[in-house]
Curated annotation (Swiss-Prot):
InterPro entries listed in its UniProt record: ExbD (IPR003400), TonB_ExbD_2 (IPR014171)
Listed name of the protein: Biopolymer transport protein ExbD
Species this chain originates from: Haemophilus ducreyi (strain 35000HP / ATCC 700724)
Gene responsible for this protein: exbD
Domain of life: Bacteria
Family to which the UniProt record says this protein belongs: Belongs to the ExbD/TolR family.
Keywords (A to Z) from UniProt: Cell inner membrane, Cell membrane, Membrane, Protein transport, Transmembrane, Transmembrane helix, Transport
GO biological process, one term: protein transport
Source species taxonomy: Bacteria, Pseudomonadati, Pseudomonadota, Gammaproteobacteria, Pasteurellales
Amino acid sequence: MKKFDEINIIPFIDIMLVLLAIVLVTASFISQGKIQVNVPKATTTQAMKADELAKLLTITENNGFYFNDKLITKEDLSTEIASWDKTQKVTLKVDSAVAFEKFVELTDLLSANEIKNVAIVTKKDTSKK
């Protein structure tokens, strides 16, 4: 039998490249799972850390209501909000194409249940004026 003088690393590199390809493909599918919302631009935005305890309420451009990235009717959302603690943190993510009326409906639901700790998601407006 012939003795190996050194270890052949080419098969190891092949396996690593296949694993890298799998990770990259999987990561792209995970990022596509989020609801696409074109949030409005604002010049006075503040960077905030994502709060894991905050509830996420989203309105898409086709006026669909989402609670933590799951489609929900306005009636079910109203029931859900009524069950929250008054100090509950809420993040609103509203598409810029949505009629202002829908935004008011959502904030009215929160106000009716005395939810005051609300953050609105916007993009930083970088256009020079």
